[in-house]
Amino acid sequence: MAVYFVTGKLGSGKTLVSVGKIQDKIVAGCKIATNLDLRLQNLPQVGRFAKTPRVLRIPDKPSISDLLAIGRGNDSYDENKNGLLVLDECGTWFNTRSWNDKERQPIIDWFLHARKLGWDIIFLVQDLSIVDKQARSALAENVVYCRRLDRITLPFVGTLYSLITGSKMPLPKLHVGVVKYGDSQLSPTVERWLYTGKNLYNAYDTKQAFSSNYDSGVYSYLTPYLSHGRYFKPLNLGQKMKLTKIYLKKFSRVLCLAIGFASAFTYSYITQPKPEVKKVVSQTYDFDKFTIDSSQRLNLSYRYVFKDSKGKLINSDDLQKQGYSLTYIDLCTVSIKKGNSNEIVKCN
């Protein structure tokens, strides 16, 4: 079983990375229980047509009866199929006063034995120092430190950009959760959770306020198909054309620029002159009247210069380009072959 304390400053993405883990568990077919207000149909990997998610909403500050009501998270011995319990605003539960509160003791005992019930747990707190030391020792198997990369300024480049534009250099809104094995920042890093914000913002209530006077008990979310998917109507032709016009108007400049680049590239490719291929004209020679005028040996290669009956010099490289093969016999004797013809040429 894995227990995670997810920490980070306000707006650092604690809830977002936790919703990302909820999505991963739903896709894997696992059971979920949480005190977060979720919009399951907006989870990008779940969608409005999903029929199988099992997600329980528990009170903002659950009692022992609420935790007992969610039952088992996994009936098998495969811990990869464990359910996931996600609880936000846990700083008020695990401070020194609450940890020693006798009324909270049954809840703490349940957390300590959650492994036997097949639950993985994610606790969200702003800072680990809020949590009682005994609670950290007993439960903090993994601690996740959340960071937002768009709040970081790149050295030198970011400063130069700010001097030129007068504003902070925009960076991708990427949320990183660094998972440490243990409750110390010096503990070894076991993994990193990476999530982009845009596709998960609509999947939960980012302005949810937690209250001790939550008036609803444990209940199950309707599957996205029952709440949204079955009411979905396919777009007719007119609606599709209207959407097409909207998107064309929105991206018209980018589209025109792309078409311009593509047209220019196509035109330059078509009108580019093709390189001329030099044709080697094969000639016939009367090798009976050839003599070796000179020969040269370079390591394992040989080069000959021949003289025909008219005194014209022809080198062996030109003959080879015309398809003749030369076989070295000695510096004064060579065999010239092409097809079925084979001639011996010697020195004068």
UniProtKB/Swiss-Prot annotation:
<keyword id="KW-0472">Membrane</keyword>
<dbReference type="GO" id="GO:0033644">
    <property type="term" value="C:host cell membrane"/>
</dbReference>
<dbReference type="InterPro" id="IPR008900">
    <property type="entry name" value="Zot_N"/>
</dbReference>
<comment type="function">
    <text>Isoform G1P plays an essential role in phage assembly. It is required to increase the number of adhesion zones between the inner and outer membranes of the host cell. The extrusion of neo-synthesized phages occurs at these adhesion sites. May be involved with G4P in creating zone through which the phage assembled and extruded.</text>
</comment>
<keyword id="KW-1043">Host membrane</keyword>
<dbReference type="InterPro" id="IPR027417">
    <property type="entry name" value="P-loop_NTPase"/>
</dbReference>
<dbReference type="GO" id="GO:0016020">
    <property type="term" value="C:membrane"/>
</dbReference>
<dbReference type="GO" id="GO:0005524">
    <property type="term" value="F:ATP binding"/>
</dbReference>
<keyword id="KW-0812">Transmembrane</keyword>
<keyword id="KW-0547">Nucleotide-binding</keyword>
<feature type="transmembrane region" description="Helical">
    <location>
        <begin position="254"/>
        <end position="270"/>
    </location>
</feature>
<feature type="binding site">
    <location>
        <begin position="8"/>
        <end position="15"/>
    </location>
    <ligand>
        <name>ATP</name>
    </ligand>
</feature>
<comment type="function">
    <text>Isoform G11P is also involved in phage assembly, probably playing a structural role in the formation of the phage assembly site.</text>
</comment>
<keyword id="KW-1249">Viral extrusion</keyword>
<keyword id="KW-1133">Transmembrane helix</keyword>
<keyword id="KW-1188">Viral release from host cell</keyword>
<keyword id="KW-0067">ATP-binding</keyword>
<dbReference type="GO" id="GO:0099045">
    <property type="term" value="P:viral extrusion"/>
</dbReference>
<dbReference type="Pfam" id="PF05707">
    <property type="entry name" value="Zot"/>
</dbReference>
<comment type="similarity">
    <text>Belongs to the inovirus G1P protein family.</text>
</comment>
<comment type="subunit">
    <text>Interacts with G4P; this interaction results in a complex that spans the inner an outer host membranes.</text>
</comment>
<protein>
    <recommendedName>
        <fullName>Gene 1 protein</fullName>
    </recommendedName>
</protein>
